[in-house]
Structure formats: C-alpha cells, structure tokens
Swiss-Prot record:
Family label: Belongs to the PsbL family.
Gene this protein is translated from: psbL
Subunit composition and interactions: PSII is composed of 1 copy each of membrane proteins PsbA, PsbB, PsbC, PsbD, PsbE, PsbF, PsbH, PsbI, PsbJ, PsbK, PsbL, PsbM, PsbT, PsbX, PsbY, PsbZ, Psb30/Ycf12, at least 3 peripheral proteins of the oxygen-evolving complex and a large number of cofactors. It forms dimeric complexes.
Topology within the bilayer: Single-pass membrane protein
Protein name: Photosystem II reaction center protein L
Family annotation (InterPro entries): PSII_PsbL, PSII_PsbL_sf
Subcellular compartments: Plastid, Chloroplast thylakoid membrane
GO BP, one annotated term: photosynthesis
Cellular component, GO annotation: chloroplast thylakoid membrane; photosystem II reaction center
Residues spanning the membrane: 17-37
Length: 38
C-alpha cells in the first residue's frame, strides 16, 4: 500500500476525527431535513 509510517498515531487520530466530523454533518443534515420537511 504505502511506506511504513513511524508516526502512525496522529494519522489515525486525524482519520477518526474526520469520521466523527462526517458523522456529525450527517446527523445535522438529517435534523435540518426533518425540520424543513415538517
């Protein structure tokens, strides 16, 4: 895949924070859509 990265923890931390950000945006989109369609 790619070269072994010695600094693996910050990459995983950024990836998990990115996933949490996407999840938060998804929840906000669902809330706003339900608010507008109600």
């Amino acid at each position: 895949m790619s070269a072994p990265n010695p600094n693996k923890q910050p990459v995983e931390l950024n990836r998990t924070s990115l996933y949490w950000g996407l999840l938060l945006m998804f929840v906000l989109a669902v809330l706003f859509s339900s608010y507008f369609f109600n």
